């Protein structure tokens, strides 16, 4: 595995089209990402995306490479700069990633939220689904839905994707991240390949070690299924939010046990592949180091998104300016070697924790 950290350069004015993806439902808003020759989509870093730092882009390169090499075909992300983009769409940066489109002319994607709105299933309570960043999602009801009960192969593919999402410590693997690939008549062909790897625990909060460790522990606890202690989430003042966190705290474990019981072959296949990855991370760790590219930003401030949120989402310029003053110069220069070494160790630990749950004889 050689990780590829060269930067692709685009000019916004040279785009050949725009990918219009209406964010359906829960997080509303339209995204018009530019498309360039070779069917490459430029996906910018967003100023209002929670906890966003340049590592979000590096994480996409890192995980798409690993998923492709060790698990299943997936579109490969590359670092990219699109000059002139921020000038036109100021809530985005000129920095981001470039990724080939996941579907061909005439095809389209239908995510799980859209799917269950179109084909309701009483086992899936889609109306009460919430897209909440930094939360783990329960996939058991989705597997129980008639469509996946009747389509074994797609269910196995989904099981593999859920397992990989746990491995990459995805803090945002919600029902809009999983999609079916549809033909021109809307007929479902297969599960779409995995995209979107930004919210990987190992690459979050590089500038704030205590928060980094807190969320790493949340991931570990959810994998192991440790019971929630009374009052554990009392620091979440909003009762809805608190309920979500309490549910999230054990749901990875439930997903793992469900997949292990219902999809034993996929579980074995995943364990074999994860074991190979763990060996490579140990024996050839140099291959997995993130090489910071000098053309790309190298400063991280996990709170800077609050400025963007105030300015572009809440339209509150006063609040935005206050955050700007408060956070000015707070960013931390990224030490890519340091980040990579700790990420490699954390990933190996998570593989071991997953193995423990998935290999355990009941």
Identify the role of each PLM range:
Residues 55, 132-209, 349:
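Conserved kinase catalytic-core segment
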Residues 61, 65-69, 156-165, 279, ...:
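A broad, structural surface signal
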Residues 183-362:
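C-terminal catalytic region of ATP-dependent kinase domains
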Residues 1-124:
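Conserved ATP-binding subdomain of kinase catalytic cores across diverse folds
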Residues 102-142, 226-257:
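Extended low-complexity intrinsically disordered regions
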Residues 59, 63, 95, 108, ...:
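Alpha-helical structural motif
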């Amino acid at each position: 595995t050689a990780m590829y950290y060269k930067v692709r350069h685009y000019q916004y004015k040279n785009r050949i089209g725009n990918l219009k993806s209406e964010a359906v439902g829960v997080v509303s808003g339209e995204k018009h990402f530019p498309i360039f020759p070779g069917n490459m989509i430029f996906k910018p870093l967003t100023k209002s995306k929670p906890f966003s730092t340049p590592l979000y882009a590096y994480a996409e390169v890192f995980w798409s490479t690993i998923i492709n090499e060790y698990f299943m075909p997936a579109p490969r992300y590359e670092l990219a700069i699109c000059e002139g983009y921020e000038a036109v769409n100021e809530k985005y940066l000129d920095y981001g990633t470039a990724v080939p489109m996941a579907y061909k002319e005439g095809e389209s994607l239908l995510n799980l939220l859209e799917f269950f709105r179109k084909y309701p299933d009483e086992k899936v309570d889609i109306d009460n689904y919430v897209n909440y960043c930094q939360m783990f999602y329960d996939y058991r009801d989705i597997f129980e839905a008639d469509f996946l009960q009747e389509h074994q192969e797609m269910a196995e593919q989904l099981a593999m994707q859920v397992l990989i999402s746990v491995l990459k410590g995805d803090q945002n693997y919600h029902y809009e991240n999983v999609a079916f690939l549809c033909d021109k008549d809307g007929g479902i062909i297969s599960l779409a390949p995995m995209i979107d790897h930004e919210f990987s625990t190992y690459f979050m909060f590089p500038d704030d070690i205590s928060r980094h460790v807190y969320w790493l522990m949340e991931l570990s606890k959810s994998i192991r299924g440790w019971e929630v202690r009374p009052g554990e989430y009392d620091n979440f003042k909003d009762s809805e939010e608190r309920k979500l966190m309490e549910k999230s705290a054990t749901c990875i474990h439930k997903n793992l046990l469900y997949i292990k019981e219902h999809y034993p072959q996929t579980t074995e296949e995943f364990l074999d592949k994860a074991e190979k990855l763990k060996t490579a991370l140990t024996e050839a760790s140099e291959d997995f180091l993130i090489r910071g590219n000098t053309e790309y930003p190298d400063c991280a401030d996990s709170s800077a998104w609050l400025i963007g949120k105030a300015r572009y989402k809440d339209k509150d310029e006063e609040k935005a300016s206050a955050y700007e003053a408060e956070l000015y110069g707070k960013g931390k220069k990224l030490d890519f070697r340091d980040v990579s070494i700790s990420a490699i160790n954390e990933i190996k630990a998570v593989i071991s924790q997953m193995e423990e749950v998935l290999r355990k004889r009941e």
